[in-house]
Amino acid sequence: MTIRTRVAPSPTGDPHLGTAYIALFNYCFAKQQGGEFVLRIEDTDQVRSTAESEQAIMDSLRWLGLEWDHGPDVGGEFGPYRQSERSDLYKKYAHQLVDDGKAFYCFATSEELDKMREEQMAEGLRPKYDGRGLNHTDDEIKANLAAGKPYVIRMKIPSEGTFKFNDYLRDEIEIPWENVDMQVLLKADGFPTYFLANVVDDHHMQISHIFRGEEWINSAPKLLKLYEDFGWEAPVLGHLPLLRNPDKSKLSKRKNPTSINYYKEMGYLPEAVLNYLGRMGWSMPDEREKFTLNEMIENFDMKRVSLGGPVFDVDKLSWLNGMWIRENLTDEQLIQRFVDWKFNGEMLAKVLPEAKARINTLSDLVDLAGHFVGGIPTYDPALLTAGKADEDVIRQALQFFVWQLEGLRSFDKPAIFAIAKEVATFHELKIKDFLEPIFVAITGKTSSTSVLDAMEILGSDLSRARLRVALAHLGISKKQAKNIERAYREYPSA
């Protein structure tokens, strides 16, 4: 049997460190045994999925040094590798489950389901689908279908007992069926949910082992029951520990940069980032901290993964990155890395048109536009509140601005300005007064090139990181944080 693993990210945002971590461990497991690695794109969310995000995922994984044997850009015998291109297959299998009595139609509207949940919560019950679709007679189902009434297809779940399964990395896990919902398999728009699409794809692509994050443990009964319902052999299933912040909280972009692109833009070496991800819950037999991808593959043993939450510490990554620079790069190689990073024609072409009208000598460019080739600028935090606006208002407005930028699909000047204008208006600030602290946070100065142009050139990850540092300079107490979160719920676009 060919060992075949996969990673299946959704192209709905920035390429995440967690995606790279899961991809790396699946990749090493397969390659250590002479197997194959598959990249599949889960783009069934047609509202949030973008081609730009898909390309960013592939670019970031390749930047790290990971390649795939099968995927949307390289093809393969199991394609297509975008779920949006396999929708007919999912519909076929969803209806097959209905015909086999393993799934059922549900015609309940979203309003009816909202009311159901409200009533359950009012009674102190955990919100859960109540199985109302199971009560439809055959005649009712035929009439609803003939009338073109919208429906979803849900899987049938036992009402009592427990489900037991063996996890590759853990002891036997037992989950009561009462904690498992009647999962929607096919949505009203005809697209599948994660559960159906993944089972169908993993079966057809002959995936032998699935290693995913531990947040999916409670969904394992649904996944494995679908294999049973189809009469297919299930792959080996294992759940890797989640990456954690130094305070042990789940790695989240609201606390620390989580995008692979951020670390690329900050000047980290891909070898060092991949090396550090390889140390997340796993170590070399000789405990050495610095190793290459090939060395990791040669020594990899998934059974040696520690289940305690591995901590992603940026300071430790920086230390390791420094080791890679000093020990692995010649002066000539380091020069080329600098050129590839920021000191190149592509970057200058972005910066010079804006700067040209404001410089008299070439050396003026360093002071005027140095923030384009730096990481996090240093400045006097007092500059953030030197304007007319109240400090508490600026603090909340900046936090709203960061949260709104997180959901921005196209990080360009018009879109950034629109959000800034909306946030300023909500806080009764003049846009000029709101842009002043943003200017300082992004450039580290009170005068330079356009801050909105700078944000577009720097990109989403680095811009948001600089804004988060500004918020840290301003300081947010636990009480203030709660008040800001409460106020954000009233924000129109929250």
From Swiss-Prot:
* Short motif 'KMSKS' region, span: 250-254
Give the subcellular location: Cytoplasm
**What are its E.C. numbers?**
6.1.1.17
Q: Name one Pfam family in it.
A: Anticodon_2
Q: Tell me yes or no: is Cytoplasm among this UniProt entry's keywords.
A: yes
Which reaction equation describes what this protein catalyses? tRNA(Glu) + L-glutamate + ATP = L-glutamyl-tRNA(Glu) + AMP + diphosphate
UniProt family annotation:
Belongs to the class-I aminoacyl-tRNA synthetase family. Glutamate--tRNA ligase type 1 subfamily.
How the protein assembles, per its UniProt entry?
Monomer.
Protein name, entry field: Glutamate--tRNA ligase
Gene name of the encoded protein:
gltX
